[in-house]
Amino acid sequence: MRQGGGGGERMVSVLFLLLIHLALCQAKCVMTECDGEEDSNHPPCKTNKSTYLPITVTRSLNPTYMARFEKYCSYLVQEEDKAQVCCTELQLKGMTDRISNAATILGSCPSCFDNFAKLWCQFTCSPDQSKFMKVMETTGPKNVVVKMEFKVNRDFVEGLYESCRHTWFANGLALRLMSLGGKVSFENFYGFMGTKNLAQSIPINTEFQFSRMKNAMNIPTTPCHKSAGPKVPACGAIDCPTNAHQLVDISKVEHLGTKVFHPHFPDFEWLLKICGCLALTVLLVFILKYSCHRRSAPNGEDGCYVDLGKGNLEVQFEGLCARYANAVIKHPLIFVSLGLIVAAACCSGNFKFHSLTHSVDQVSAADGETRRNEKKFIHSFGPNHRIEQIFINLPPTTKSMFNMPLFEEMFQLVGNIQNLTACYGNSSVKLDDICYKPIGKNHGCAIMSPTNYFQNKWTNFENAGPPTIDDEIFDDQHWEHLKYCIRNPLTVSTYSEMSCFGEFSGPIDPILVFGGSNESIKGAEMYYTARTIMITVLIRGPEDQAIAWETAFLNMMSRYEMKHANFTFMTETSVAEEIHTAVETDKIVSVIACAAVLIWVITMLGINHWPESSILSALVHHKLLISISAVMISVISVWCSIGMFSLFGVHATDNAIVVLFFVITCLGINRIFVIIRTFQANGHCYGLPNISYREMNHRISNVMRRSIPIVLTNSLICSTCLFLAGGVLPYVSVSMPAVEVFARHAGLAILMDTAFYLLVMLPLFQYDARREMSGKCEIWPWYELSNESKINLCMEAVDGNLRSPVDWFKLAIAPLLLKKICRIWIATFFFVSLIIACYCTLCLEFGFNQVMAFSETSYLTKHFQNMNENLNIGPPLWFVVEGDVKWHDPKMQNKFCTLAGCDDNSMGNKIRSLAYAENYKGNYLHGDVNIWLDSYLQFMHPRGSCCKMDGKQFCDPSNATHCSSCSSSSVASLTTTEYEFYRNLHHFLETPPSIQCAHGGMALAKPAINLTRNGKIQSAYFSTFFKKLNLSDSIQLYDAWRFAKYLADDIERELEIPGVKVYVYSTFFPYYEQYLTLSTTVYTLVVLVLFVAFVTISLFLRVNLAGSLVTVFVLLSSYLHLMEWMYLLGITVNVVSVINMAMSLGIAVEFFGQMLHGFYNSKKPKREERAFAALVSNGSTTLSGIFPAIMITAGCLSFADSRVLITYFCNQLVGIGLVCAVHGVVYMPTLLAIFGSDFYQNVSSEEESTDEAELQDTPPSTTSSTSSTSETSV
């Protein structure tokens, strides 16, 4: 009995002890609200009772508490109607407010946010606080907690960190805002949350203890790729890289490549068309040339099929020219009057002329794709900001940008800019009147500058200081705030209790402010080493007022000096103004060039004889009138071309006009040299004392008959070259209006110059020829050579004793052609050089350095170099969605957004993933991404603090404690009606971003949405940036455009929304669309010009088919050698050089046409002698006429300020002159001597036969001079 009873007593004792132990081990609360405090953000107090147990709350008694509690801590509700908690209602309110603020940062990833909320629910409200929490330090009589110890299982903290470390917020990692120093790491993340910071709503210090002991807090975490609860989606592809997400395949993007001819050779279809055109052309020429009615054969049979009259087509053409010459001789005043009337009528259009000043109008066709997109973008969203920039470069002697004198100067500079006043009409304009204010008119201007981290106030800079003595390790106390803002630009209050936001109430990304940093340093600390400080002022006021202010800004900055740094600057109008300034300087060069050419023409056009003692006798055979008239007519031709185009609203650039005078003067001079040299070479310029009027007419008519065909043929080919390049049918567009307009103006100017040659120069020539044959002085017509002097000159001409400035050519150069060994060496060298030229052509590269538009001494040249070296990011890029999109439909929203629940291949995910991708080959995106729909969805999120309603009244987020959420949905997409969607969208667009609501859409979303009149979204854009692009590398800029276009097309295809289009726009796109078809343009231009040359020469000159083919071959060779010249001088291929390349073919015809005409009109029996005769008569004309005119023009252009003129006109003109001269004077006669015909086809027109018959009736005294001097040149 006792034993049994004793055992029962022991059992009771054990149970009693167990109950006591359980009572002692029961969890308790370790902190609670402080007595008398009503501030929910006040630190808690330590519990006064060691037995402070959790409190029980029920739904029936505490409905408000339970509603707030379940918002973030629903997992702690053990039963449906009650929960055990350690937090009072005041503590709960403070915790939910702090978690709501975190929802703004972490809310895009529900799993991350859920884990984060669990951590602080456990910390604040867990009924098991005493198991894993311990008060380490208190203060005051109320035992206000200063420091807590929080034991957390490592599995939980690692799970929380891993679920959040890839979450993005405001175009950066969210944890960047929740990590010490802005450096995202496990330790910095928990170090930040454990460090007291009232500005960040962290009321106490917390020492996190990480362990895997059983007493450490440990509850399950949700990985980012899993759902945190029913109807809650997993994190999106951007926030959770563990999800399988494939970047857009960009391997199919078309790149320009560096080589012009290798990767972009035309396709087979293009070649087939060209071959077909070639075959048809040859057939047509053969029919017209060789199937016309010739003179009857001895048997009386005709040897052809098409009756075009007596003689070959070219002979008929010469006959027409002869009849025109006779008309000019008979009625010179009528033709001159007609020419003056035409000139006056055409020049009258100059009253409507104004030059192209807007750069985009010069480089991109108005109907091009990029221009159409630009017009749509500006029409939908308004013009882009005008940008004013200042780059401040630290001198080598300055070790760091953290320099007090430097910042003092910067504050002064920014202050001067803000206070700068410009005159505008009768009023004044200040920066505050026109600057961009993203948050509204009541806020400051958007100035991206380091000084704006201090709100551009020197007093704020002086008052900024470190909070503790430990921070004195910095160079100066003022730099702590700046460095903190560089690390965390979204910080609203630093240790100095100052905001990092600028005076425009927005953040300043250090990537836009600091340049020239040491890129080997990772993270935001890289910007501490910046050697360049960038100040950017954004303007979005009326254009006229903005231009007035920019003019004042330029005047101020051009005189401004800084003692402790160097700087460069530019404004939106700088490019146009600097180009205009350079053109004004180049106009002087143009005048000098025309004067130099005129002096050369006066010197070389006449013959230097001094037959009598009077100085006036030396001026008998000079050509002052012809020389001056030729230059003046070329100038008038340019003005006529400009006037005619101006009448139809087609205007050229100032640079184009300057170059036009050079080109047309050179070509016009050549025409005069052709007729004058023909006149001189046949001995017609010398007249006997008794020369008859009919003999004079015969000589003049004969010269005109022989020179007009070659002038017209050359003009036709040259103008055709330019018209083709200028987009005249057959259309060969180079997609650059300034160059196309230049080509059209030049083509028309050549035709006008030819017309004035026929209407004005020929009558003047016949007058001057009569004067010269009569032996009269040009400037004093009353002086006349004696009969003895006239006879002596004629006799000396017959004996070959008279010398002209080009006789050295006849004596030294031309005889080499008669030597077979010389011809072999020349031909061999020609073909070897042709092979080398082909190789160099294949190495020719695309490109255009836009800095070359300015002189080397221009302030813009230095600034562009500064931008290339120091910019950290490229231009902005906009992806525009236009069409009928049902934005209120959640399924449709998922096609565009990047939040949890959105499609992995949504538009936003594609853009954002590429913008954040690193080392992805071929990717051009980098930097911040603005997805307005994401901001709107987060603005509407029920857990957020943005969209709140009080009944039907929208609540200001800064005062919305009494309001309820606009949305009852717990997912990212909005399940609302269309009416509710647009009602809330209006509130969203009018809400500025703030501490209480970071997702307000006024700053970034409002400019991105284009609404119709009834408030529906008509179009909207998502924006990002390009990576850093080389502004001097046009190939890279072109490839960036093609990449963006490919991405937009891919997005549009993936959306599969009928009627919805996606296009891209960036400010530089219109400048590089030209390269899209440039390769094909080069091929097509060459082929078409060669066809035109072949047809024209074959039909209108006395040339057989072999001669035409030789000419075309030499033309092609000259083209290839010109590209070799370009390669050797580093001249890249672009629309400017392509126009010059097309023009070179036209100029080459001026060289080759004369040689060909001279060869096939020579009566020598052998082809070597005929080539010799052509070289003597026509080669000297070329080397004394157009060739020196080109070289003189190029020499004058070398003094121009514009490097575009120097590179693409001066250097290229030198190449054109040298290549054409060598081909026309060396290669052409050599090939004709080898492959040309051995006979002269003596077919005469009716006029030629009539002239010969008339000469037979002429007395011997008058014909002797003609017959004796007809071959003096050969």
Curated annotation (Swiss-Prot):
Mark out the compositionally biased spans (Acidic residues): 1245-1255
Which residue ranges does the record assign to the SSD domain?
586-767
Q: What GO MF terms are annotated?
A: cholesterol binding
What are the record keywords, sorted? Developmental protein, Disulfide bond, Glycoprotein, Lipid transport, Membrane, Signal, Transmembrane, Transmembrane helix, Transport
Q: Which reaction does it catalyse?
A: cholesterol(in) = cholesterol(out)
Name the Gene3D superfamilies for this protein. Answer: Multidrug efflux transporter AcrB transmembrane domain
Query: Which Gene Ontology CC terms are recorded?
Result: plasma membrane
Its recorded name reads NPC intracellular cholesterol transporter 1 homolog 2
Name the gene that codes for it.
ncr-2
